[in-house]
Amino acid sequence: ISKLVNTDLDFEMLQSLLVGNSVEFYDEDEKIKPGIDNCQYTLGTIRKKKLRKVMEKGKELKEPAQSIYMIPETFKIARILFYEFGPDRSFDAIYSEYELKDSTQLFPMKMNYTIKAQKTVKIDLVYSKIVLNEEQTFPFKIPENYEAISIKEKK
């Protein structure tokens, strides 16, 4: 995925994308511009008008752009859109079918991801069951005939 979107993805970024949380690829010093588009709140690194020109006319961006679309009633993320330099280089994540889990947290049960680069990759993800904040165990036994080895670090 990192090669397709031309950025370093760490575990926290990937986890955020899988559960519908915000992911920021923009420069921390960059100003975020608020707006409203199709009855959703938006936050983006470029104005809506400029983004539409890029989307409709295939113009190239001078810098990467990010837009986040939020559902007004819940302020949950409906869509995260990243545009990269060059035509047809983008990452689009759409979150839908939010359900209340543990009577405290809204969680997207359906996600659609589209990565456009030299090739287009589409991933549709639907959760059937989600359990939050449950402690995980990994039970295993080490065989008696196991001999421990030590690994030396390379310098």
Question: Predicted segment positions?
Answer:
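Phosphate-interacting basic helix/loop segments used at nucleotide- and nucleic-acid interfaces
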Residues: Y26-D27, K31
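Gly/Pro-enriched, hydrophobic low-complexity segments
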Residues: I32-E144
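Acidic/charged, solvent-exposed loop-and-adjacent secondary-structure segments enriched in E/D, K/R, S/T
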Residues: I1-Q15
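Scaffold/interface architecture of coatomer-like assemblies
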Residues: G20-N21
